[in-house]
Structure formats: structure tokens, C-alpha cells
Amino acid sequence: MGVVAEILSMNRNIQNLALWSLEGPFDPLASVITQIISVQRFSINQYYLFQRQPHFDWTNFKNLTHLDLVIDDLELGIAGCKSLCSLPLLTHLALNSGFTEQLVPILLTNSSNLKLLVSFCAIDLDVDQMQDLRLVCLSAPIEWQEDWYYGAHGRLDFWSEAETAQQRKARRQRARARDVSIDLPDFIAATSNLRLA
């Protein structure tokens, strides 16, 4: 872990960062990561950050636009979500968690800048939350590293797939709304000449 923290401390202008399969101790890493404020795309297991800091504050990441977050602990996940909601540029958030059902409502309600919330787990939410265009459920990429590499280099990745799924969801909702809507003046005009027997 010391090597990772050392490398990161020497490179402060990082825009794309993925930290996976790390082994502790994580304290040096957490303190270095909070100083890399230039990161825009970030993928990490929240355990690396929250292990000893249950109230890890995401607000230092002012430039963060895309966050792929693995959450293994509900209490820590809720604490992290509260500060995530205040990030001014965070528009894309992916959750890989068994606690997605508990976290999605918090994020949808409190994240005004969030445009896309991806869940990689099956979830059972109320109808209004499932109808929210920001929420998209996907299968996890088979090759995370390859997917991350493609996205970091401007190619198609799971974010692209999620945006396409979001567009399909919006089209389906518009089509459903057209199917069930009745133009009341036309309905009245069409039925006004009917006589009751």
C-alpha cells in the first residue's frame, strides 16, 4: 500500500484513477487520495477510504464527474452518500453494492446534479424511483480493467452503455405516456353525438 500512496503523492494531476484489489493498511492511501483534487473519473471500493474514517468527506473531489463505487457496508455507504450529494460536478455515479436499494433513494432525492445513477445489482424500489430517468440497471462488465481503459481513452464503456439504456428508457416512457393520454377535447367531440338508449 505504501508504494501506491507514494506513486499517487508524486502525481497530483491525475484525471482517471481506478484502485482495485488493494491490501492494507489504507490510512496512508486515504490521506493521499483526498489531495488528488484533479481526478474526474474514479473507481474504488469505499472500504479503502472509509476503513478508519467512517465519515470520509468526498467534498475535496470538486472535479469528480464519474464515480464507480463498490460499497460493502451500509452504514459507511450512507455516510459517504451524504457527502457525495454535495459534489458540484458529479453527474455519473455507479453503485456496485448489496445495499443499493437503501442508497438509491438517498442519492435520487439529494443529488441535484446527478444525471445518471447506474446500479449493477438487482433492486426492488418503489415505482416512482424506478421511473426516475436517472436510474439505470446494468449487468456488470465482464472485464472491468478493459472497460475502464476504454472509458479513460474516450471509447465505449459501461457509462456509454448506461447512457444508451437511459435514452431507451426515456423513449419507452414517452411512448407509454402517448399511449395512455387522451386528448379530452377530441374525446368530448367524438362522444357528444352519442345518445343513451
Walk through the language-model features, giving the residues of each.
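Leucine-rich solenoid repeat modules
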Residues: 84-197
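The conserved beta-strand core of Leucine-Rich Repeat
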Residues: 1-55, 59-77, 88-100, 114-125, ...
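Short, T/G/N/S-enriched strand-turn elements that build extracellular solenoid repeat scaffolds
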Residues: 5, 31, 82, 105-108
